[in-house]
Amino acid sequence: MADILCDTRLKSEEAPKVIILTHGDADGLVSAMIVKAFEELQNKNKTFLIMSSMDVTLEQTDKTFDYICKYASFGSKDRIYILDRPIPSVEWLKMKYLAYTNVINIDHHLTNKPEQYKDECCCDDIYFYWNDKLSAAYLKLEWFKPLIEKSEVYKKMYEKLEPLAEATSCWDIFTWKNLGNSQKELLLKRRALSINSAEKILGAGAFYNFITKKLNSENYTEEIFNYFFLLDEAYNLKIDNLFDFAKRVISDFDYKGYKLGVIYGIDGDYQSIIADKILFDKKLDYEVVAFLNVYGTVSFRSKNDIDVSDIAKKLGMIVGYSGGGHKHASGCRICDRDEMKKKMMEIFEHSMNKIKIL
């Protein structure tokens, strides 16, 4: 189940409800914060349920909306935001739990293009806001940009959040790699990398709470990034050790003539940076890296013109799960986590029962 970042539904049963389901990475968490900030400016009495998960499969999305709809019904005054991740499956949407409310999907993943739903009548009332050239966080800011013409308070909020959204976008869609050496670009690159470090060290809940609670600060940008820079130093020490480990355990796999490196044992919090170091190490000469982990998922990273979103999508389909993502960063599930847990419990209980009779 997804993590609950904020739940104020008990504050009022009559007030408009805002439900946000977002991706559990830095981009998704900043996105959720931006939506909440602007929605509260529009009506401070609104109630919120904000949930996040790194598992963006259709199976997980359907389960999360089962939970959301079990305890609430939604009407025309309510809003449901699905950020940086896919909408529920067509089969789930056909049950029409969300048919009478406002559903907004803001995303930028190649495998979540709105065109794939054009022939599905159950998706006709979903508003899609999609652009693969921007991160989810910056798309959220652009979504609310028309409001700045209505009031100075919206303009101030937009200006306060833009540096964070810009740096988040720079990290998430990898444009930090193309920045130059001017003072402005070096600062932007440092901010982009520190956002990833902060989210990975703090975890989703603490990261979201920090960027939210600091919103009332007059020096918002300086305060959050000064803290993120400190966390970035600690993160980089860990990265150096993990890179040495990755080089020792990586194994080769030939995929359609590409040299693919397979690594087991690197936590998801460190995979993007480790992959970047491996892919651009000329001695290693890998074109694709695949990370396998204990949660039953595979994360792909690539360079040049290799589209791993297609690889992840096809692999997910073959093993019975959904998959996808960006051209150079994608993932899918290949094992059921609940089944893995069940198997471990069975082995544990069986072995413990044997110990009792020894």
Say what each PLM segment does.
Residues 170-251:
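Hydrophobic, aromatic-enriched interface-forming segments
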